[in-house]
């Protein structure tokens, strides 16, 4: 009789150890299906890359293993590194404690604004083709916490439901520990009575205890590691949803090797960005441009308006009333007007929307804030045009991808003709733009790149008074024409999205920066 309590205790201890260590290879959990009948899934190895989903499977729900059946890379390091850096963990980045001490809203913002770009770049085209063959798809993330991947899977991939690991929280902050599967419910009530098919990789299935959700599937298709190595990168034009807006400072995929290179570059980058800033702020353009080139900055001008003697050569384009020229450009970084000023070899004024006072103090050219009141803004811009040239970015905010936001028609009512300027830039390590509270560091981050590059293309003047079919075009129509011409020169796609749309998507606000920041 005394052996029965011991047997029960030993059996309970054995079950605890088994849950912690996982099942040995080639063994699987035996759990209840959604219908309540215990089942084993049929495992189909070597799922062909040209696997076509027939009509019978379309009516079933696909359980998609995100790491095994969608992403090409098996390394999860870059995604945790992105959360650690973009959520401002500061010194905790060095020890890679990604979630420790972070608030939920900060991690959610990184997952919404930064991670989708890197997930899209890691998607395998072959895996996405299989996902598109199903009307209902449930995403299963075995290793990446749900909060990191849910927004991407629902907003960009259109998945119905996401099941993933949860990170434990204490008093509203993460403690960096993952909850066990037994500590939560799957929440599959919506799939009650629906046949399910699983899709993942062989490596994930046999390397550890597989997720209980796959025991609810009738069949599980597994891709071999050899097949997955042949997966191709998903082209941008095949993204499930266009990637127009994204945030974050890192312009590269933070693999362990790339992250180590960045950390080794940082000490030199800090000194380099200070040097470059001082050069552009304090020295004449004729001196600062060669010095900048010597430090690794690449600048290229197309259709330069500067003649051989260093004077602006607009020739017959000069306006008879001696007013300044209004340059209209797309918006890539805070330095757009500065580069135009450098290429013109003279000081210009720039209209800005919401920039920090630090950026205004460090600007080598005069900046004037727009009030978003058309009458007041027109009143401010008129005297500036009487004194000299003026640069305005009608988009009102930057866009990193090959898209143009809607152009504000304010500039159309000021002058009879405008001078479009098409801008393109490259950053190989850090982005010089942000929607976060550290916008005052934008130009510092841009100058921290080893080889930042800018291309400034001056275009033919365009009239603001346009008549088509006997009707004078409205101001917004003229603004759309200017947008289309710049987009054609750059190969960018014009959109109707605005500054407000960008900040609501990425930051949850309307993008107004406090001048005291």
Give the predicted meaning of each segment.
Residues 1-56, 158-164, 180-183, 187, ...:
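Cytosol/nucleoplasm-facing, intrinsically disordered, low-complexity tails
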Residues 1-27, 33, 47-48, 115-254:
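C-terminal cap/substrate-recognition subdomain and adjoining C-terminal extension
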Residues 43-52, 113-133, 286-325, 374-382:
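A short, well-structured juxtamembrane/interface segment
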Residues 49-90:
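Active-site neighborhood of HAD-like aspartate-dependent phosphohydrolases
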Residues 73-133:
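A metal-dependent, Asp-based hydrolase signature
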Residues 78-98, 105, 249-305, 361-364:
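A transmembrane-helix-recognition feature enriched in membrane-embedded lipid enzymes
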Residues 152-169, 281, 299, 318-375, ...:
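Catalytic core of membrane glycerolipid acyltransferases/transacylases, capturing the structured
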Residues 268, 358, 389, 400-473, ...:
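A cross-family acyltransferase "interaction/gating" segment
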């Amino acid at each position: 009789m005394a052996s029965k309590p011991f047997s029960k205790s030993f059996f309970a201890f054995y079950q605890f150890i088994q849950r912690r260590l996982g099942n040995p290879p080639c063994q699987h959990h035996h759990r209840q299906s959604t219908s309540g009948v215990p089942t084993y899934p049929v495992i189909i190895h070597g799922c062909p890359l040209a696997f076509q989903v027939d009509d019978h499977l379309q009516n079933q729900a696909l359980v998609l293993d995100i790491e095994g059946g969608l992403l090409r890379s098996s390394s999860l390091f870059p995604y945790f590194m992105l959360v650690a850096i973009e959520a401002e963990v500061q010194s905790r980045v060095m020890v890679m404690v990604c979630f420790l001490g972070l608030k939920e809203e900060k991690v959610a913002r990184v997952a919404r604004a930064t991670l989708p770009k890197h997930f899209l770049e890691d998607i395998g085209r072959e895996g996405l083709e299989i996902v598109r063959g199903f009307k209902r798809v449930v995403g299963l993330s075995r290793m990446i916490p749900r909060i990191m991947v849910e927004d991407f899977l629902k907003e960009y991939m259109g998945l119905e439901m996401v099941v993933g690991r949860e990170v434990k929280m204490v008093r509203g902050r993460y403690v960096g520990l993952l909850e066990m599967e037994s500590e939560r419910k799957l929440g599959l009530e919506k799939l009650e009575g629906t046949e399910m098919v699983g899709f993942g990789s062989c490596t994930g299935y046999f390397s550890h205890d597989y997720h209980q959700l796959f025991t609810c599937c009738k069949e599980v298709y597994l891709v071999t590691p050899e097949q997955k190595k042949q997966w191709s990168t998903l082209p941008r034009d095949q993204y499930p949803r266009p990637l127009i807006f994204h945030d974050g400072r890192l312009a590269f995929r933070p693999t362990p090797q790339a992250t180590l290179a960045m950390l080794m570059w940082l000490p030199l980058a800090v000194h380099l960005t200070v040097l470059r800033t001082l050069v552009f702020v304090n020295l004449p353009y004729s001196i600062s441009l060669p010095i900048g080139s010597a430090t690794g900055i690449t600048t290229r001008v197309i259709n330069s308006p500067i003649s051989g003697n260093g004077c602006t050569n607009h020739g017959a384009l000069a306006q008879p009333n001696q007013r300044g020229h209004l340059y209209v450009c797309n918006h890539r970084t805070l330095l757009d007007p500065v580069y135009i000023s450098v290429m013109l070899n003279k000081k210009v004024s720039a209209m800005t929307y919401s920039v920090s006072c630090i950026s205004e103090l460090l600007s080598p050219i005069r900046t004037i804030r727009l009030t978003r009141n058309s009458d007041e803004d027109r009143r401010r811009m008129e005297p500036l045009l009487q004194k000299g040239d003026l640069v305005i970015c009608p988009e009102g905010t930057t866009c990193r991808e090959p898209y143009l936001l809607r152009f504000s028609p304010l500039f159309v009512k000021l002058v009879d003709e405008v001078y479009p300027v098409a801008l393109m830039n490259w950053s190989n390590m850090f982005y010089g733009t942000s929607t976060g509270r550290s916008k005052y560091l934008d130009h510092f981050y841009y100058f921290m790149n080893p080889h930042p590059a800018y291309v400034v293309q001056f275009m033919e003047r365009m009239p603001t008074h346009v008549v088509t079919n006997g009707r004078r075009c409205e101001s917004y129509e003229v603004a759309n024409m200017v947008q289309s011409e710049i987009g054609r020169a750059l190969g960018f796609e014009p959109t109707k999205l605005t500054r407000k749309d960008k900040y609501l998507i990425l930051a949850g606000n309307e993008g107004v920066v406090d001048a005291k920041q």
